[in-house]
Amino acid sequence: PALVRTSPRECDLILVGEDNLVDCADWLGNCAGIVLDLADMPPLNDAEIEAILVSITCKMNDESMILLRDRVDRVDHLFRLVVDLDLDGAVIDAAAPGDSRAASALPRIGLAARAMNLTEQGRHLLIEIDEAPSAEDMLIAVAAGCPILVAPPPEDGLEETLVWLDSAVRGWMHELGLDGLEKLSRRNLRALDYDTASISGLRLIGYDRPLPMWLGN
């Protein structure tokens, strides 16, 4: 499956922004769902967002998915909208201001998702990064409660990259002493620097507990 702006396949999601809000109507009946990109829209209140979604979904199949997309620095607002509007999930752009890596953004996303009980409600979390993921990125995403990554295709062959990722993930799982991805959690993650530990609440490497400001949470 792919996230596209035009000409979707039946398994693809359409990314809907200000530029293709009208033209997307031509493909709504031939896709797996839509992702309304709030980062690519003018400021909207809840009622305006709901009105746009109603106008779009009336032309879609009943089983099609409806998701919202926004920046990682607005993740709490994004998750609230998903719950209040009873949508299928969210796409979070992990390329935060300052060009931070997904590794530091994902724990924050996981904390917000847990606070809203999104996983227990059966809603989907998709994390978007701006480069092909490494095995470490994939494991961090799963541990943070976000099992789906959206990323550009690798520069090398896709099949070769998937084989390499499978091998690398298995190696990491063996090193962690885990036999299934479902057993991976935040407890397996470590922050490599103080800033990441203070923002995310992860244990700082070499310090076997969260920083003092997180011990009460």
Task: Tell me what each language-model feature is.
Residues 113, 139-142, 147, 170, ...:
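A short, terminal or domain-edge coil/loop segment
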Residues 3-130, 134-155, 204-206:
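Alpha/beta enzyme core
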Residues 56, 109, 165-172:
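Hydrophobic alpha-helical packing residues
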Residues 1-36, 168, 172, 179-217:
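N-terminal capping/small domains of soluble enzymes
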